[in-house]
Structures are given as C-alpha cells and as structure tokens.
C-alpha cells in the first residue's frame, strides 16, 4: 500500500474518531452563559512584564481590552522594538481554539452568502452553541480570549491584525519565511516587530489577501498589486520564484481620516504661505504635480490640497489602487481593472480617455508612469485642471522623466503644467520628517536655448527648518486673470492664510470640519474672515515678495 493511501486512511480514521468524540460530547452537553466582559469581575485578558534588555518607552492599546503594543528601547544598539502583546492560551485552550475554528469555518463556508449586521454577536452565539455541544465549561476570561483569536481570524487580518489596528503604523513589510516583520511607525520610524510567519502560514496568508481583494496570485503568476478591503495598498509575492526568502508582502495602510492642509501645516510639511498660495492656485484652476521619493507624502499632500477644490466643481479621480479620498459631492472615482475572463484590461490610459468625455473640471490621477501621462498633458493643454504624482527627487528629474522613455511628453506640452511640488522624507535633528522641499513654477520654453524654464516660488531651508519665498509668476498670472490690483491679491492671500491659521490653531484635523469651513468661505468669504479674525489670538502677516500694497 502506498504512503499516500496510508495517509488518506489515517485522515479518514481521525475524522471518524473526531465525530465519535463529538457525539459523546453532544450527548453530555453543558450550559454556557455569556455575559459582557467586565475587567473587574473577569480579570485582565492580557498582561506583560516587559522585555529583558529593553527600556519601556511606550505602551498603548490597539484593540482594547485584547491587544496592546509595547515599545522598548535598546540603548546599547540604539534601536527600538515593537512588541505585540495578545492574550495567552494554555494547551487545552489552544486545542479548543483549533476545534472552534474548524467548526465555525465550516459553517461560514456553508453559509457564505450570509453577511450578519453584527458579526461579533453572531460569533459569540456560535461559540456558545458549540461549547455547549462540546460539553465544555469555561469562564468568561477564557471565553473572551478565545473570542479574540476567532474574531481576528474571521473578521480581521489574523496575526497581522494588531499592526493593522495601530493608527501610528504607516507601512508593514514582510520579507520572507521566519523573518520578523518591520513597520514604519509615525513616532519611531522603522522598527522590528515580534511578528513573523512560517512557510505554510505565510503562503496561505498571501493567497488570502489576494483573494479577499479580488486578485489572482499563484506560483505561475506570483506577483500582484492590490487594494485590500479596508482600502490599504498591498504588494504581494508568493513563493520563492521572485522572492528567494519566501512569500512577501508590503502594505501601505489606508487612513480613513485623510490629512487636511491644516494638519500638514501643523507638521511643518508646508507653511501657511505655501498653503494659502496652493489654495488660491487650485481655486484659479492651475495644474499641479507632486513629486518625491517613496513615502515622501506625495499622495497625502495631493489628497489634502484637493479639499480646496470649489464645492460644486466636477472632480474625476483615476487610480491603479484606491488611495484618494475626497470629501466632495460631485466626485466620480475610477480604478483600473485587470481582465476578467475574455474581457480586456482597463488601464489608466483607458480611464483617462473616458474621463474627458465626462467633462470634469478637475482631473486627479493617482500616479503617472507611462502612456497615460501623454493623455494627462493633452487634457492640460485643452483646458482641464489636472493633479497627479510622480516618483522623482528634483524638478529637473521630473522634467527628464516626462521628456524621455517611457513617458515621452513633448516639451511644448509640459508648458501647460503650472506648479510642481517636490517633497522629501528627511531628518530634522533625530527625527525623520516630511518636507515640501520646493515649489517650482513652469514658465515656458526659453526661445534662445530651447530649454524648459522654471523658477522657484518656495524653498525649504534645512539649516533652520524654515521656508523661504520668492517672486511668483503664478500669482501674477492669477492677479491679471482676476483683474485684481496687487493690494487685492495680497488681501486674498492674507484672508486665506487667516482661515488656515485659525484651522491649525483650533486643531481641526477632521476633514469634514475642515472642508465645511472652506466651503463656507467660498459661499461668504467676508463673514468667515470676520469670524476668524475675532477668534484668532493674533493676526497673520503675508510674506509675498513681488506683491506689494
């Protein structure tokens, strides 16, 4: 008899023994009374005494009362450690968890169409019924520790769930089998965690992430990029064909509450003068491009300044993976799609061509990398206001990328771009920060040399972490288009700066509140300015070289 047949026979016998044991348990029965978890009555679900060799610098809940994060600091090696603390289980509870998981999973597979409104209550009821069938009596402390792991498995991201729940984490990276995950933490930057995956577990998890987001991944097609159900971006690799250390993934977490311009000012990514300038430029239909390296904040900034788009304007966004979140009523969002069955891929180029038929006033493209850039600049040249991002570390690099393969935008068409913001992820002291390094203005083609001319309107000064401002061609263009005098232009900038200063001073980080005041300003600027002036601790000064009263 072959080994395969013997293994199959063993599996069948195990199932028969399992069913017989289950039948005996059902006949015996038990009664489980489930009550709400109360820390004083039931005791803590999780505890932790710290890590040897590490000084505790932070501890906070990510899923109270089940899981918290411990941040330790190793002074000898000058490094932090991110340690996830979850409920402990003894051997009996671990076996019970596996049995519950199998039975609940089977029920979910059988009833896959059913989506309960309150999955937590349904899960608790399923656990109660199964425990009664098993004849197992457990206390509420053990019940809720088991509940945590089951809920994490069926409704969350399994062992990755605490990291996905942590609001301070921006990126999560898994580099292979048995390798600790690394996270990019808003406070402690790149940190090693105590979370890792073995081969079978990691392969299954990568496949699950792909399937949950409607993508296919296999050994024959081992790499895919996708958007997870919660909106996070994920780059997935399966097996060892393209990633020799094993399956891997990188997740760029999605924030349900996007950064506002006030938040970017508070972080000193931009200053008030830059943000007032961008507000007026966006209102005046100037096209913008945000450039920078990986994790420099390009998309975050573009998403933030889109809150300045006038409320009734039609906005259309085009993305490979869903990142943009506009609080705008007249907004049409579109995302690329891989071919399904015999259908064709729907690319950014296809979506951009289609977008022009929707007659949008503002077109926002997640990132330009190829042929869609030509259509984007054609849209600019035909009067559409467009915003996008690009990977590049300087103004000249942006121009070089646009003019050469694979993008190949003619120099004459690049003239239609008005403003170029270049962002960077850098250090100020011991902290890693994001700064808008330069705001450049495209002035046109030099008739003498044939080169594309640009000037710098704002520039970050690394020495004192401040921003300097120079003359602005864009502001002069806006003044002429609006028929304003220089003093009227200065007043418009000052009023916008007052509103932004007020929003920053009031710590208005909720994008709904921020957008509400911006929209109110568009409806009645005088009323908003008077209210803001009355509530400000001090008035603002507009530093606008070349714009004198």
Residue map of PLM features:
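N-terminal accessory targeting/assembly segments
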Residues: 1-213, 535-549
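Active-site phosphate-binding and catalytic loops of NTP-dependent enzymes
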Residues: 155-165, 210-225, 313, 407-410, ...
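P-loop NTP-binding catalytic core
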Residues: 174-287
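Switch/coupling sub-region of P-loop NTPases
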Residues: 277, 282-291, 302-427
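Walker A (P-loop) phosphate-binding loop of P-loop NTPases
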Residues: 295
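Conserved lysine of the Walker
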Residues: 298
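Conserved P-loop NTPase
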Residues: 419-504
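Terminal-proximal interaction/regulatory segments of ATP-powered molecular machines
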Residues: 495-549
